Structures are given as structure tokens and as C-alpha cells.
């Protein structure tokens, strides 16, 4: 599901978002471009934290674009880190609910509840879209040529989501990508950080569901 697939009120133009970081004036000065991107991402993230219902889409759209930046690996890494921190700040500690367009889920709800559900749906789609980029790159081999954040950076961002938001959406997909990255990455810190995250989750797992899921996925990958 694309992050831009939203209903009525959310389908406004991003007139306040500047997508000109690929302009010649920036490409001619890589360090200046990186600084400009950093400053702009920081401003967008701050606005999104203060007003997630109106600014989240702007921030997500630009940062996601920069995460796939073909001009600078450093800018892509900065964008990846910014988006990770933004989502960690905004995501709740429970599973978000997406709106099923086929099921008129908003019918009969009050305006306040409808607004809340739409905001939750947007956040869920934004999170899913970003995780898709991270999992795609994290699963690449050490010598793979990828646009955007490196497999190592992608893996570390996924570990942060798993550690700090273990009860949020898409835990299974995150676990698969982390375990795969631990086996394929030339960066040994990926395996070390993943092991630490798994240990912390298992220690706090009162009913054993998270622990069982981790063990099953590890066994599945080893068999392959």
C-alpha cells in the first residue's frame, strides 16, 4: 500500500515541501547539499512531531525520497536515520489499525473517531512503506550495489524498531529481515546488536509468544 493512498482530506498537494535537492546547485557541492538536507529533514521531523495529523505526510514523502537518493550515500543514511527516529517518536506501543477500503469501516463513527482512525491509518501506511525500503536493503548481500541506505544501516534501523516497538505492526517481517541480515552482512555489529535485541525481548516475554516466533524464524532460515 502506498503512503500516498489516502482519503479526501489527506489528498492535499505538498506545496510547502521542497523537492529540489537534486538541482545542480546542490549536486555541485556534496557537503553543502548534505548539510542542507540535514537541516531541512530536521525541520520537517520537528513539524511532524508537533502536528502529525497535518505534517506527517510531508515529512514522510521527502525523507523517503532522500532515503533512495542516488546522488549521495551519506544523504541516504541521514534520511534513513531521521525517518527511523521520527517514527520511533510517533509510533504507539500497540498495533495500529489500517482502514479497509472495502468495508466502510468509518460509517456511523463520530467525527472525532473518524479523524483518529484516519491518522492511525496514515501512520501505519507510512511505517509499512518505510519498512519495505529497509527490509529490501537489509536482505542484500555485503557486496550488493544498492541505492539508498546500506544493508548495514538498514539492518540497524530495523533492530531499533524491534527493540523499542516490539508490539507494533509487522514484527514478523522485521524479524525475518534482521535474521537474514545477521547472516549475510559483513558488519559483525549487526549480529551483535540483533542478538542483544533478541535477548532483551525474550527476557521480557511473559507469555513466550515473541520467543517462539524468533526461534521459529531462526530455524526456518537455517534450514534454507
What feature does the model see in each segment?
Residues 1-224:
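Charge-rich, low-complexity intrinsically disordered regions
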